[in-house]
Amino acid sequence: GNLFRENQQTGELMLDNNELERERGITILSKNVSINYKGTKINIIDTPGHSDFGGEVERVLNMADGCLLLVDAFEGPMPQTRFVLRKALEIGLKPIVVVNKVDKLNCRPEEVYEMVFDLMFDLNATEEQLDFPVIYGSAKNGWMGPDYSNPTNDIKYLLDQILEHIPAPQQLEGTPQMLITSLDYSIYTGRIAVGRVHRGTIREGMNVTIA
């Protein structure tokens, strides 16, 4: 998808780097990355999908302005899809549906699209939420586009849809206020707080109080 420099090392399960996550093939702890595209910084959060990690899911969703609902083109919505999608719809997020793995043998992207629509309707999505854009593609082969039968050369279509449909964060003036959703540690920088600035701005070297 041309998101990495030529000298960067990439691999499978880049965000699911916890040993247990790799072993079980699921996301347990939320991860966040960012990319710059057409002059806009896009922050991407990978959230757990299982109800066993509901607290983590709710904390992460409060950081987001929109969501990508990733669905397998063969399997369709999974049981855990219902849990996370319900949480996202309840707080008013409008989803972009991404039907992935259309390169799979016997995949059924059109039927899966209808299954996603029915699921959202069943979860009492608003008319605006039901009017969701849908993207088809193959993450394995590095492409996303509007038509599953016509592969593109990259994932730029997905990024363009994010810029078009996900609203920019609201800028509230005042003293800095940040909701911390997770803590990390680096041997180079020490403790790291990850979260969202809800009011004011934070600058490098600023003294802040953590409460």
List each model region and its residues.
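P-loop NTPase switch module centered on the Walker A-proximal segment
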Residues: G1-V71, E75-P77, V84, E111, ...
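Conserved catalytic-core segments of large NTP-driven translation/proteostasis enzymes
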Residues: F121-A211
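Hydrophobic face of alpha-helices
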Residues: G54, M78, Y113, I155-L159, ...
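Short, solvent-exposed amphipathic alpha-helical segments in soluble enzyme
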Residues: R59, V84-K87, R196-H198, A211
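Conserved C-terminal guanine-recognition region of P-loop GTPase G domains, centered on the G4
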Residues: L61, G66-Q129
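Conserved nucleotide-binding/hydrolysis micro-motifs of P-loop NTPases
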Residues: H50-S51, F74-P77, K101-C107, A139-W143, ...
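Ordered, soluble secondary-structure elements with a strong preference for glycine-centered loop motifs
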Residues: G54, L105-E110, Y148-N153
